[in-house]
Structure formats: structure tokens, C-alpha cells
Amino acid sequence: MENERRTDQKTGMGLEETRLSDILSASQIKATDTYETPPQIIWIDNSTIATLGNFSASTGKAKSKKTFNVSALVAASLAGKQVLNYRAHLPEGKRRILYVDTEQSRYHCHTVLERILRLAGLPTTADSENLDFICLREYSPTVRISVIDYALRQGKGYGLVIIDGIRDLMLDINSTSESVEVINTTMVWSSRYDMHIHC
């Protein structure tokens, strides 16, 4: 019995060693490697602010017009033209946008959606085929993360994902472990689905 336990532990450790060795090998960056520049998708004036496979954030005090700023960024991406100071171009196969709001009511989310459509020069009486806007206010952080993950796994060709209220993906904003977990999740999403996430 004791020998069986030791063998199981060694086998388990051997699998873990193999897994870590594989991760180490796959993670090495070598001078002889070549990488393509990630596609640039959003600019302010002539400065690139977003590429596929990365994420960014808008910061500011409460009620400092962050959502309006993000609305202009989304409108530029949706229209493929300049809106305010934002210029955007999502590549073929990555033209869809997922907008996730975690804090506002459905009424206020609808107001933001209308603003985006107006800024993009699109009708406010018809849904855009390239924009999915979801309101997750009434759900728990765990459910919100699961719904976003589910939406991304559907393979709808999202090039840009907006998470308005990333702090609402965690129970305790002061928990460093929870914060790290949410940031790691967004990094995995942006890399796995080759899209830009803006929070």
C-alpha cells in the first residue's frame, strides 16, 4: 500500500515536471525567433493605442466621462473611421465588437448604445451586426466572467471587447489575489482570441 502511494506521488510529480518543462520551453524567447508586429487597430491622432492580442484601460475619477470616451473609441472601431480624436480599423474577420457593461441599468446601457451608433453615423433604430452590447449588472462576478468567457468561445470574430466596470468582475476590489486573477483572465482572453480588450 505504501509503495503504491509512493509510485502515485512519483507519477504525479513526473507529470507536473513534464508540464512545467513544456511550459518553460514554449515560453522561451530566442534571438533567432521572429514575430510579426501585432495588427494596430486604434489610434489617437498618430499614436497607436491598441493592437490585437493586448489590452488597455481608461482611468479617471468617477463621473469623469470615461464611458463617453469609450463610446467614441467603439464608434470609431464600428465605423472604421475617425470619431473625435480616435481612428480605428478592425481587420477582416475581427470586425465585431463585444461591449460588456457591469454597472449601469438597461436604460443607461441603451443610452450608451444609442450614443455609439450616433457617433458611428449609424441608425439608432436598427441593431448593428458588428456590435453585441450586453448588460450584466444583476449578476454575480463569477457569472459575469462565465458569460463573457462563453461569448468569446462562440467564435464570433470579435476584434475589440469593452469591459465597462472591470472591478465588478470581482467581489473585493481590495483583494490582490482576486485582482491578479481577473487581470490574468483578461490576458488569457486577449491572447487566446487575438483581440484587444479595453477596460
Language model feature labels by segment:
Residues 58, 162-164, 194-199:
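Structural recognition of the conserved hydrophobic beta-strand(s) that form the central parallel beta-sheet
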Residues 1-14:
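Interdomain "pre-motor" coupling segment immediately N-terminal to P-loop NTPase/helicase cores
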Residues 71, 75, 79, 142-153, ...:
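Amphipathic, non-transmembrane alpha-helical secondary structure
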Residues 51, 141-142, 179-180:
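A conditional alpha-helix N-cap/helix-loop micro-motif detector
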Residues 180-199:
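Substrate-engagement module of ASCE P-loop NTPases
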Residues 67, 145, 176-180, 184:
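Non-membrane alpha-helical structural segments and their capping/turn regions in soluble enzymes
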Residues 12-116:
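The Walker A/P-loop phosphate-binding site
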